[in-house]
A protein has these predicted regions:
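N-proximal, solvent-exposed amphipathic alpha-helical segments enriched in charged/polar residues
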Residues: 1-30
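C-terminal boundary of histidine-terminating zinc-finger modules
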Residues: 314-325
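Short glycine/serine/threonine-rich phosphate/pyrophosphate-binding segments
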Residues: 108-118, 139-140, 212-220, 242-245
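Extreme N-terminal, non-catalytic leader segments
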Residues: 25-28, 35-103, 335, 339-342, ...
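Phosphate-binding loop that captures ATP/GTP phosphates
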Residues: 122-184, 190-198
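Conserved catalytic-core segment of NTP-binding enzymes
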Residues: 90, 206-207, 213-314
Length: 362
């Protein structure tokens, strides 16, 4: 009968293409059982990758069958997403494991489109995902997610999130008329956002994606200090002026102790739909160079494509409108890279410890 060591040695030859590590070293192999010629085990991933389950299973079965004496192999691939650490001194959010801020130093770089497609990509890969539209002066997620109406409240205090495409969504856009301007000062806007965040009944989320307001002003700084953020994704175009403002966003998150999960370069190249000629309208590799300069992960580049805009405007973003297309595949790859970076962070164990209260009477 084959031994466990023989089997693990064979399985260690299979590399996870997302992490570059084998499944044995990463301690992903669980519940290994050998009964004569039959083998069964689980593979537990720390990030969502449902579209790759079949490929993982096939590679692992082939490796296991390479061991003499093994005839039948059963592999069950699962995902277990853990809570990870946030800034010190910030109150955690119940039922939300990880909060990811999608930010940009300036408007118009495609931050909201990136945020909604990242949320949908994580969901498509098997995660439970929420989306908070924190762009209080220009909320766009209700339109992009194709959601109308107002959120309901069972107890008169907390709101139930709106939902579409399997994503839980909250936005100030659900609470005001579509053409109403939010003429609010910073403190009022920040308070409203905190209420949206903490008075929404989020239900067992692996990830809450926050579509941050553009810029690095008072609202962004206050949110970064008060919201328990696992990490931030910076969206930029290759254009020099966009990169200049993106660097300011990086500095802001660094000052408040929020790690940068990576850089997304949007509108990186335009491919003519008539002749196929590719042109770098906003410059070339600016986001990639910035990521290298700051020693940050370069999560990926997206094209300047009219379909991305049309699909978002029609309330069916690219990942749901064309799930098997090239652009959706890029969004899914970016989402996986981001989730892997989150999984590599220190886990949050605060819920494992009792709260210690000190009073004058003790």
């Amino acid at each position: 009968m084959p031994t466990q060591d023989q089997l693990l040695q064979a399985l260690a030859t299979v590399i996870d293409p997302n992490t570059g590590k084998d499944f044995v070293t990463s301690k992903s192999i669980k519940n290994l059982q050998i009964t004569e010629g039959d083998v069964a085990f689980d593979v537990e991933l720390g990030y969502p990758a449902k579209s790759q389950f079949a490929a993982f299973r096939k590679s692992l079965i082939a490796a296991a069958k390479g061991v003499a004496g093994i005839q039948n192999v059963s592999v069950n691939v699962t995902v277990k997403i853990a809570s990870h650490s946030v800034q010190r001194g910030v109150q955690l959010l119940p039922n939300v494991k990880n909060i990811v801020a999608v930010a940009s130093g300036k408007g118009g770089v495609g931050k909201s489109t990136t945020a909604v497609n990242l949320a949908l990509a994580l969901s498509a890969e098997g995660a439970s995902v929420g989306l908070l539209d924190a762009d209080i002066y220009g909320p766009s997620q209700p339109m992009m997610m194709g959601i109308e109406g107002r959120p309901e409240s069972v107890d008169g205090k907390n709101m139930e999130p709106m939902e579409n495409f399997g994503i839980q969504v909250m936005s100030i856009g659900f609470l005001v008329a579509q053409d109403e301007a939010m003429i609010w000062r910073g403190p009022m806007a920040t308070q409203a956002l905190e209420q949206l965040l903490r008075q929404t009944n989020w239900r067992d989320l692996d990830y809450l994606i926050i579509d941050m307001p553009p810029g690095t002003g008072d609202i962004q700084l206050t949110l970064s200090q008060r919201v328990p953020i696992t990490g931030a994704v910076i969206v930029t175009t290759p254009q020099d002026i966009a990169l200049l403002d993106a660097k300011k966003g990086i500095k802001m998150f660094e000052k408040v102790g929020v790690p940068i999960l990576g850089i997304v370069e949007n509108m990186a190249v335009h491919i003519c739909s008539k002749c196929g000629h590719s042109e770098h309208i906003f410059g070339e590799n600016g986001g990639k160079k910035m990521a290298a300069d700051y020693k940050m992960d370069y999560l990926g580049a997206l094209p300047l494509d009219m379909q991305i805009r049309l699909q978002a405007d029609n309330g069916r973003p690219t990942v749901v409108a064309d799930p098997d297309g090239d652009v959706a595949s890029i969004y899914k790859a970016i989402a996986r890279k981001m989730a892997i970076t989150v999984a590599a962070k220190a886990k949050d164990f605060s819920s494992k410890f009792p709260t210690i209260k000190i009073s004058k009477d003790t």
